[in-house]
Amino acid sequence: MNNFASNDPLVIAGIVYSSRLLTGTGKFKDLDETRLATEAAGSQIVTVAIRRVNIGQDPHQPNLLNVLSPDRYTILPNTAGCYTAEDAVRTCRLARELLDGHRLTKLEVLGDKKTLYPDVVQTLKAAEQLVAEDFQVMVYTSDDPILAKRLEEIGCVAVMPLAAPIGSGLGVQNRYNLLEIIENAQVPIIVDAGVGTASDAAIAMELGCDAVLMNTAIAGARDPVLMASAMRKAVEAGREAFLAGRIPRKRYAAASSPVEGLVG
């Protein structure tokens, strides 16, 4: 952990993290590549699709936890592939059982298979139920500022608006909505979905997002481990740029050297 990270931590549900890059564990060619990419990213939180990745459900298959130990990483189970609140809640309960009472969970309830946009009605319903059951909910949602605030108000510990559709690689498509969400939030805002390359991650962080979560942008790259390293640097650079404060955009030039005392 570098000195800057230690002085500017990310806090989720009372836990302090030095890394602001959260990574997924799907789509890699094997568990060894998953491990190497996660290490290169410097992630401390890794998200796992309970319905797709084995963390103990099948004793006859390779177990992700053998390469990404819960002693080293915060395992963030997610409800990817769920299309109803009931399925999502059931999946979270299974994850809590598999992870010995682990309360932190990433909720996503999808609306359709083409866009993978969240079903906001089902998302709200599931979030309310999970909070009532004492889960610590990090929630994937649209970039609607009203909905984001509502999810915060019902007790979600982090709100995760999409930058663009899952896996699209389009980057931040509506920075003004994201800015509105960020400015009104009292919980961490984490861009989730749509990042394609390092500049996308930097832009999200420059806007003031607290962190970025990605999977496809790393796992789908020609060299996933190298891309993970690039994303780590982009997130760090974007955060520093946000804190430093960019100069205002101007229509005309402004000389960087003084005009007083010119020779001749």
Curated annotation (Swiss-Prot):
It catalyses: [ThiS sulfur-carrier protein]-C-terminal-Gly-aminoethanethioate + 2-iminoacetate + 1-deoxy-D-xylulose 5-phosphate = [ThiS sulfur-carrier protein]-C-terminal Gly-Gly + 2-[(2R,5Z)-2-carboxy-4-methylthiazol-5(2H)-ylidene]ethyl phosphate + 2 H2O + H(+). Keywords: Cytoplasm, Schiff base, Thiamine biosynthesis, Transferase. SUPFAM superfamilies: ThiG-like. Catalyzes the rearrangement of 1-deoxy-D-xylulose 5-phosphate (DXP) to produce the thiazole phosphate moiety of thiamine. Sulfur is provided by the thiocarboxylate moiety of the carrier protein ThiS. In vitro, sulfur can be provided by H(2)S. Belongs to the ThiG family. Homotetramer. Forms heterodimers with either ThiH or ThiS. This is Thiazole synthase. The gene is thiG.
